[in-house]
Amino acid sequence: YVTFDTYLQDFDVLNRNKRYYDGDNVWGCIKNDMRIQSLLQSNGWFGEFEHPVPMTVSEKLSPERIKNVPPEKRAFKIMNPRIEGNKLAATIQSAQGEVGEGFGKEVVAGWIAQFSARAIAVMTNRNGKPYVMMKQLITYDSPWFPSHEVAHQTSSPKATFKPFIESVKSGLNDVKTAVEAAVIPLKEILTNIGHSDPSTQLILESFDL
């Protein structure tokens, strides 16, 4: 598997879609959410390679799908989230399975991994500035086009080769290390998921979903 450090987003900075995020709000959603804390303790806070989106106009995402990362969709795990200045940083480790291997190979091939919040939130006006206030942070996914300019990989990937033993046979994950710079444009999407509170929305920070 491949491990690297990243920024997930920044705070109190106007993003490319003219919105702000509050650091205390986001950090509180991480520290005070029993689900996220449990997932972090078990190394099980996973994200997907792109946000979950309907594949047809008529298709709708269920609340269960929005709030969960199915095992077959796991691309990476988020570890050691931390505040660094006005940014949320974390360590990323590629997941096992086909999707995780694909994610890791893209990073090895030179793609700079990008990250984007998946959250239930409300929009508020703070001294004339539009702030996204999270009610529940679900995870961070890795789209091609995130909305926060800083939300990208910040270190070269480190490959870990771990023995896999089955009966009397053993093998190693085939992972190489390399990284090149890239600049990714971004855009933010708000998709209403039909909560009783019309101001409550699903935040998916991605481009042209």
Range-by-range predicted roles:
Residues Y1-S167:
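Signature of dsDNA virion morphogenesis modules
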Residues R126, H152-L209:
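Intrinsically disordered, low-complexity terminal/linker regions enriched in Pro/Ser/Gly
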